[in-house]
Amino acid sequence: MNYASFIIKIIKKPKQSFFEKEISLTEISGKLYQIRNKKKIEIPVSLSLWGNLAYDTMQYYHINDYVIVEGYVSLRDKISSGYQIPVDKHIEVSGFKIYPFLLDSIQLTKMDK
């Protein structure tokens, strides 16, 4: 397992579950984009967040938001084949930090003078 940082686009609504009544787990499906030889490659990513970070993620981040994630990376066998480019493995990240990058859900309003 390696510690790394990524910019991930959230593609599905985050799902929250609870363990032992108080421990929160939020799972996010996202895409990691790469550009190779002038081709855009989409890599599926599963992101898991625990505890208070899981609560904050459910509150602040939504579909089509881009986030910067720091965490431990692991490769798993591919579960589904619903992505455009076939990949035999997918990336799972256990997130320790998450930061907003481009939030689609923020509405900027004009202040009245």
From Swiss-Prot:
Q: Residue limits of the SSB domain?
A: 1-101
Q: Name one GO cellular component term.
A: chloroplast
Subcellular location(s) per record: Plastid, Chloroplast
Task: Check the record and name the InterPro entries matching this protein.
Answer: NA-bd_OB-fold
Keyword Plastid carried by entry: yes
**UniProt keyword annotations, A-Z:** Chloroplast, DNA-binding, Plastid
| Name of the protein described by the UniProt record | Putative single-stranded DNA-binding protein ycf41
Organism name: Trieres chinensis (Marine centric diatom)
